[in-house]
Amino acid sequence: CLSRLHDTAADSPAHARPRVLLRFRFFDQVSERRRSEAVVPSVQAVLPRWQLSRQGRRGWLRLNGVVSSAADCRELAEQLWLKHEQLLKTPATPTRLTPQALVAASEPETWRQRYATALTRGIDLVNSGDLHKLVLAVRHRIVLADTFDPLPLLKRLRRQQAGSCRFLWQRHTGDAFFGASPERLLSLRAGWLRSDALAGTAGQGDSGAQLLRSDKDRREHELVVETITDQLRRNGLTPRRRRQPQLARHGNLTHLHTPI
């Protein structure tokens, strides 16, 4: 499929060229709304129809479409111009929405009991040797009073979580997945593949000195490093890593970080 992509603006910078966006899951999972219909695939790939990119003070707008005749080219050019005009008229600052105005109802905080049960089970699994490391997560359901626009929140995350990757995945109306992550899965540049082991987080009031001395966090961090390097070796690569982790700061959070 990628061989069928033809870039009509070959002189555009690398970040403005067509991008195929990928979404990965750890496992195949069933959506709650479609639990009886289908399994959500563990990998999704999308070539966006509209692509807007920016570097510094310059921006690029790209329209991806199917062309089979000269009329198709003309129609795409007109759509591109109309979208350009629409963007110029868009307010620079989105409307501010306070969290209190959005929340209509919140489920009772039964998650505390669920978390306590899972925590007890997790500690038993680690103590028995069945697991070396376990990360728990909590799901909280909130009913919104009005339509929610995630863009202002992403803008706030950009300021609060500088250096993180902000993402928004929305293929269907009313179904969006967004957030900010400091982790990089893989990057490939100039023949070099890079990954990052990011595990172990400093507690409140710790600038990172206590984190570097924490035996627990260092052991958990090393498990993540070993897992990544083992996977790379299984795929025929020869990973290189630092002997000691360093500190990586993302907003108010400080993590142990080992580039690979």
Task: For each feature predicted by the language model, list its residue ranges.
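Acidic-enriched, low-complexity/disordered segments with a strong bias for Aspartate over Glutamate
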Residues: D7, D11, D28, D72, ...
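Cytosolic ligand/metal-binding cores
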Residues: R54-L88, A180-P259
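Active-site pocket-lining segments that scaffold enzyme catalytic pockets across diverse folds
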Residues: P94-R184, H221-V224, I228-Q231, N235, ...
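Non-catalytic accessory segments adjacent to catalytic cores
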Residues: L2-R139, N235-T238, R243
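Conserved, well-ordered active-site substructure
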Residues: C1, V20-R58, H140-L198, R240-I260
